[in-house]
C-alpha cells in the first residue's frame, strides 16, 4: 500500500525540504542548481509525458505525469508560489 499524496500535500513536503534542507535531499540539490536547471527538468518531463501518452501504458504515463507535477512544484517553491496562486488560474 502506498500513501496517497495530493497536490497540496506534495507542495507542503517540498516546501518543508526547502526550509529544513535535510542532508542528501535531491529536492534541495535541485533547488540549489537554480531556475534554469529546474526549467530544463520541466521541459524534459513534459516531453516524456508526451512520449508516454503516445507509446506507453497508462501506468507509465501516470508516472511521467507525476514527475512533471513534482518538477513544476519544485519551481513553485523556488519562486515562492503557493498552490492558491495556481488554483486561481485554473
From Swiss-Prot:
The keyword Nucleotide-binding applies. Transmembrane segments: none annotated. It is an enzyme of class 3 (hydrolase). It catalyses: 1-(5-phospho-beta-D-ribosyl)-ATP + H2O = 1-(5-phospho-beta-D-ribosyl)-5'-AMP + diphosphate + H(+). GO terms for cellular component: cytoplasm. Coiled coil: none annotated. One of its GO terms (biological process) is L-histidine biosynthetic process. Disulfide bonds: none annotated. Pathway: Amino-acid biosynthesis; L-histidine biosynthesis; L-histidine from 5-phospho-alpha-D-ribose 1-diphosphate: step 2/9. Keywords: Amino-acid biosynthesis, ATP-binding, Cytoplasm, Histidine biosynthesis, Hydrolase, Nucleotide-binding. Gene3D superfamilies: MazG-like (1.10.287.1080). It is found in: Cytoplasm. Its EC number is 3.6.1.31. One of its GO terms (molecular function) is phosphoribosyl-ATP diphosphatase activity. Belongs to the PRA-PH family. This is Phosphoribosyl-ATP pyrophosphatase. It comes from Corynebacterium glutamicum (strain R). The lineage of its organism: Bacteria, Bacillati, Actinomycetota, Actinomycetes, Mycobacteriales.
Amino acid at each position: 500500500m502506498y500513501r496517497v499524496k495530493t497536490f497540496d500535500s506534495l507542495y507542503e513536503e517540498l516546501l518543508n525540504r526547502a526550509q529544513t534542507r535535510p542532508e542528501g535531499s535531491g529536492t534541495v540539490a535541485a533547488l540549489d542548481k537554480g531556475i534554469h536547471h529546474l526549467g530544463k527538468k520541466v521541459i524534459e518531463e513534459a516531453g516524456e509525458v508526451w512520449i508516454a501518452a503516445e507509446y506507453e501504458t497508462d501506468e507509465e504515463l501516470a508516472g511521467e505525469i507525476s514527475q512533471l507535477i513534482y518538477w513544476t512544484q519544485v519551481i513553485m517553491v523556488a519562486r515562492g508560489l503557493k498552490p492558491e496562486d495556481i488554483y486561481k488560474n485554473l
